Amino acid sequence: MATQFDENTVITIFGASGDLSKKKTFPALFGLYREGYLNPTTKIIGYARSKLSNEDLREKVKPFLKKPNGAKDDAKVNEFLSMVSYHAGPYDSDEGYLELKKIIEEFEAEKKVDEPHRLFYLALPPSIFIDVCSKLKENLYTESGIQRVIVEKPFGHDLQSATELQEKLAPLFSEDELFRIDHYLGKEMVKNLLLMRFGNTFLNAAWNKENIQSVQVVFKEPFGTEGRGGYFDSIGIIRDVMQNHLLQVLTLLTMERPVSFDPESVRDEKVKVLKAFSPIDHDDILIGQYGRSVDGSKPSYLDDETVKEDSKCVTFAAIGFKIANERWDGVPIVMRAGKALNEGKVEIRIQFRRVASGMFTDIPNNELVIRIQPNEAIYLKCNAKTPGLANENQTTELDLTYSERYKNYWIPEAYESLIRDALLGDHSNFVRDDELDVSWKLFTPLLNYLEGPDGPQPKIYPYGCRSPDGLVEFLADHGYTFSKPGSYQWPVTTPKM
Ligand code: NDP
Ligand code: BG6
């Protein structure tokens, strides 16, 4: 059963008129409210420059407030919206903040709040993070009570800009008060990694170079950058999802056992393993950019008028990693991510070494697949006797498909889970400053090389293909053994994202 906490919390969403707020932040707050994890006494204030009324904002977000199955619950939606108001004001001058201060203080006085609990959510472009944080600190910070600030990615563009950003933020808010959101850390299967790895003797025992042949973290999206090309052109797939989301996944997958679930113990281990990553070898990558689909119905990346006509922006990358520690030394690790591919999925593939020959001549490797999305699942491809008289092997699976096993469970959306953590002050699933520093140190030399004058030309791959040419060979070179065509059959069709 849901627990209630802190009454009369004030949540202010900066950038409330924007896309992220509408699609993620408000729906997440609604989800928490619907499930009983947001106290009905909470006051939610949207703040942005656009001149909107309370009703305008409510109407804007209303279509996105749904139950997990997509159904509407008008009564709950209306209750929730009655907690929401809007205030228009600038980001870079005091006037709007002073008005906001008055609104918040009036609410807290009326409710007789001694120790304010204020959460500020910055759903804003990074160019104004610092302005807003400075104004917040000046005008809305109280010495007593709790103030927390959630900031959205990107946290910098490279090591230097991330360091500068951090140097400006640090004097304003302490690490305890800052919550750098990486929404992948709020996904159910990502949160499951620690428990699965360290809560199962058999997995824990096999999680090392003696047993594991290769590791892959895979991100595929079936759509391109349509409409976001201008933004994406200076970002590319490596900054967009690899340096942050996928590296977080890889870190949780490869770190040592923390002493407890305590946030700092977990984050200490993450930083430690990141420091053991070898520098990325510029020759150990495969990069691509999507062209038109084979039938010509889908545009190429360069067809987007908002991108440079000779852009070398990378929309697909496969990167080989090495971790120089006792557990992982010599195990090839591949992170691959691409837009405009044949399907949408995010998964982890751990392929185990072959069993000794002799008894067997040609028996497939075990493979553990953790599907983060869509349709969360964990399956272990293993070998078993085909039922019947013959003594033949068949590759089958130990299967945990969440929609089957956990039919009646509410699986929170990433933002629901993370906003709740921030309200409770739990930093476990947020990015710490030193983590950010090490991750940028790892990726910046590669980005400088790719974006520098001698940077290679990405291979063009057709929109909608499974992977760019060369990926099969790249994976094979990194220890991945492909199953023989037709040797493994899954009886159920996996829903497409
Ligand atoms: P697949 O056979 O789809 O893929 C295995 C791996 O080989 C993937 O990494 C895939 O890459 C790669 N690969 C294969 N052929 C190529 C190629 N031509 N080019 C590039 N890469 C290639 O997955 P599984 O064997 O794990 O499972 C088979 C099917 O069964 C899947 O649809 C899976 O979802 C389903 N299944 C579902 C379960 C569940 O829902 N609980 C349980 C077990 C199986 P890429 O990913 O890029 O295609
Ligand atoms: C965002 C990226 O951070 O993550 C997007 O900017 C990407 O380009 C998205 O599509 C993927 O998130 P999810 O939760 O849809 O897998």
UniProtKB/Swiss-Prot annotation:
Keywords: Carbohydrate metabolism, Glucose metabolism, NADP, Oxidoreductase. D-glucose 6-phosphate binds at K153, H183, Y184, L185, G186, K187, E221, D240, K339, Q373. It is an enzyme of class 1 (oxidoreductase). Pathway: Carbohydrate degradation; pentose phosphate pathway; D-ribulose 5-phosphate from D-glucose 6-phosphate (oxidative stage): step 1/3. NADP(+) 2 binds at R336, K345, R349, R371, Y379, L380, K381, D399, L400, T401, R466. PROSITE patterns: G6P_DEHYDROGENASE (PS00069). GO terms for cellular component: cytosol. Its EC number is 1.1.1.49. The keyword Ribosomal protein does not apply. The keyword Oxidoreductase applies. GO terms for molecular function: glucose-6-phosphate dehydrogenase activity; NADP binding. The active site is at H245 (proton acceptor). GO terms for biological process: glucose metabolic process; pentose-phosphate shunt, oxidative branch. NADP(+) 1 binds at G15, A16, S17, G18, D19, L20, S21, K22, R49, K153. This is Glucose-6-phosphate 1-dehydrogenase. It catalyses: D-glucose 6-phosphate + NADP(+) = 6-phospho-D-glucono-1,5-lactone + NADPH + H(+). Pfam families: G6PD_C, G6PD_N. Belongs to the glucose-6-phosphate dehydrogenase family. Catalyzes the rate-limiting step of the oxidative pentose-phosphate pathway, which represents a route for the dissimilation of carbohydrates besides glycolysis. The main function of this enzyme is to provide reducing power (NADPH) and pentose phosphates for fatty acid and nucleic acid synthesis.
